[in-house]
């Protein structure tokens, strides 16, 4: 995948427009989960080291274009960066489309791009305004690479130079390693609530992986496809034929035991039982101990592991164990030489909860983009960087 890399460029005195992914949760004006900001800080440090004049921007939330609301401001991100170890002042600029002054040894955060009219539909006039701000455009937001928007695609068409930031370059390298030339056996773990939203992912992975593990609501549809009762569990009856087709094409173990509850709540008691014994008023919220152990053994024998999604409602302590066992097995396999890559919001939350971030080979910051790459789709923001790199 040939793109120009920011790390390879001479950036002294150059104006840099970095499109990062700083879309973080904010409560009462404070950042509540800083993973995406932490992932971006090395890019900012590299830009400063190279003597660039640094501008960085992102989307945050879903504001109405043309309407500024404090709730969608990047101010909490600026506050976070000012308290970090960047060592230079960070300031927020709200009106920047007609030009902005940037000095060396400072970082200018350009206010939420989604407030700009034409951002989402990639208006060329807006893209040209972004491009006019810089000498070099740096795309470093893998999480939005599947969207052709003004700040992810359009600006890359018009900027004098368009390149991939360190984070995006690392994402592409890691995903390429997992999907293009995986060490065998390759295992893919796909969780989540619905087969329908992950069907193309499951299809693509069934062709690459030696083994597929399904979890969450997806697993319930596979359980139902085997003829077991699923009670009130979330599942998709109309996708049972698809589940059967996938199960016939790839090795997909179905849980032998499960943890059930009679209501979806943090305090609902969990009952462990054989998968064939789920009652009409019960819902499956996690896998049982036997199933977790079986899956852990499969995981520990894999050489490449792609992980997207938990195997249960791990947010509730009573239904956490399955995902915890799986998480620890992935960490152990990685310690023993496997290459592991994890992506998706719920997966990252599980990694944080179980404290295994440093035990996974690569953690992808992209949700939708991660899945689309896995599906084999072309990511527009990467495609335009390739086009610019290759004349």
Swiss-Prot record:
Catalysed reactions, as listed in the record: (2R)-3-phosphoglycerate + ATP = (2R)-3-phospho-glyceroyl phosphate + ADP
Residues binding substrate: 21-23, 36, 59-62, 114, 147
Broad class of the protein's primary localization: cytoplasm
Gene Ontology cellular-component terms listed: cytosol
Pfam families: PGK
Class of enzymatic activity (EC top level): transferase
Superkingdom in the source lineage: Bacteria
Pathway linked to the protein: Carbohydrate degradation; glycolysis; pyruvate from D-glyceraldehyde 3-phosphate: step 2/5
Keyword Cell inner membrane included in the entry's annotation: no
Keyword vocabulary terms for this entry: ATP-binding, Cytoplasm, Glycolysis, Kinase, Nucleotide-binding, Transferase
Location in the cell: Cytoplasm
Family as reported in the entry's similarity comment: Belongs to the phosphoglycerate kinase family.
Known partners and oligomeric status: Monomer.
Name this protein carries in UniProt: Phosphoglycerate kinase
The organism of origin for this protein: Actinobacillus pleuropneumoniae serotype 5b (strain L20)
